[in-house]
A protein has these predicted regions:
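Beta-strand-turn-beta hairpins that frame and shape the catalytic cleft
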Residues: 22-33, 136-157, 265-272
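His/acidic metal-ligating clusters that form di-metal
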Residues: 63-65, 154, 169-262
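Acidic/histidine-rich helix-loop elements
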Residues: 34-52, 73-81, 107, 165-174, ...
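Bacterial N-terminal signal peptides
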Residues: 7-15
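Extended active-site neighborhood of metal-dependent phosphoesterases/phosphodiesterases
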Residues: 84-196, 292-297
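Active-site environment of divalent metal-dependent phosphoester hydrolases
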Residues: 42-44, 75-80, 99-110, 163-166, ...
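N-terminal active-site segment of His-dependent metallophosphoesterases
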Residues: 20-85, 89
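Binuclear metal-dependent phosphoesterase catalytic core
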Residues: 36, 142-145, 240-247, 261-328
């Protein structure tokens, strides 16, 4: 009975969210995403005030078409009030937003499923779920062309779970095989509907893939940004990156989790990027807090991306052009 009720609530929330907002390129052929990550918000804790301040400053400056939260939104109780406080900063501006969970979100007294139901009640929410596969926040956000006639960009959102579930293997969990198959099936569907041509796509989740460390340690890889710590990636590689290369659609992957990294490195033709830590001093951090911005141009390969902090921007690069130029 509980499972049936949860499923009905999910369906209601999904239908409401999808009917309320359609993502599309604007008349100038642009679509802008702001990525907030690791807000680590604690309700009524003065150390979190700067995170709300920065969120609003970034939104004032960038005026995005979509806000993506890539996990660890909250870091203390009461969980519901904390989640609402953070997401309402975006919702009150009538900006569509979406969330994927991090390893700390469900450690504050509410499960992922309970947090998901709360998020569904917040206006302008696009967070969804896919029944029957591992995790809660697995869903797709298509971005329509400026005339609304076709899917021009696909945003894949995945749940990277929390901690390893395999005895004897420590650290963090990997994105599971059924999630990878779900991605592959949908990628094939979109490619087939697009006359056999992959639709440019981006992916968002919380915990970095093992390929981040491989790329960051390669002398031949071009990197922009700051790397102050090794990626806390899963010890085991479940093959998501290989699938994305095989499908040929994903141009960029955006994660959080490692607070002292904000770099973006090109690896095997794909941009592996971190967001900028958005939180306050509720947890470790050694970078001025801010956000990553991603600007897509309709009909153009790649994208432009930069970091926005208090009163300034940095690391403004165009992918893949800036990386190919730096390699020469």
């Amino acid at each position: 009975m509980k499972k049936l009720l949860f499923t009905l609530l999910l369906l209601i929330g999904i239908v409401f969210g999808m009917s309320a907002q359609t993502l599309k390129f604007n008349a100038n052929g642009k679509f802008k995403i702001v990525q907030f990550t690791d807000v680590h918000y604690i309700q009524n804790d003065p150390r979190s005030a700067v995170s709300v301040e920065r969120i609003n400053e970034v939104l004032d400056a960038e005026k995005p078409d979509l806000v993506m939260f890539t996990g660890d939104v909250i870091y203390g109780k009461p969980a519901e009030e904390g989640m609402r406080t953070v997401l309402n900063q975006v919702s009150k501006r009538n900006i569509p937003f979406a969330v994927t969970f991090g390893n700390h979100d469900n450690e504050q007294g509410l499960s992922r499923e309970e947090l998901f139901k709360i998020i569904q009640t917040i206006p302008n929410n696009l967070t969804s779920t896919t029944e029957g596969i591992s995790g809660v926040t697995n869903y797709i956000l298509p971005v329509k062309s400026s005339d609304g006639s076709k899917d021009a960009e696909i945003l894949y959102v995945l749940d990277s779970h929390s901690y390893s579930q395999i005895e004897g293997i420590g650290g963090y969990d990997y994105i599971d095989f059924d999630q990878i198959q779900w991605y592959r099936d949908n990628s094939q569907k979109y490619t087939k509907a697009n006359a056999g041509q992959p639709i440019p796509s981006l992916a968002f989740f919380h915990i970095a893939l093992p390929e981040y460390n491989q790329a960051a340690s390669s002398e031949s890889a071009v990197m922009f940004g700051i790397r102050k710590e090794k990626a806390c990636a899963p010890q085991l590689n479940s093959g998501l990156f290989a699938s994305m290369k095989e499908m040929g659609d994903v141009e960029g992957i955006f994660v959080g989790h490692d607070h002292d990294d904000d770099y973006a490195v090109m690896w095997q033709g794909v941009l592996l990027a971190y967001g900028r830590y958005t939180g306050g001093d509720t947890v470790y951090n050694n970078l001025p807090n801010g956000a990553r911005v991603i600007e897509l141009t309709e009909g153009e390969k790649g994208f432009r991306t930069w970091i926005r902090t208090k009163g300034s921007t940095e690391q403004n690069v165009k992918f893949p052009d800036s990386y190919l130029k730096a390699k020469r």
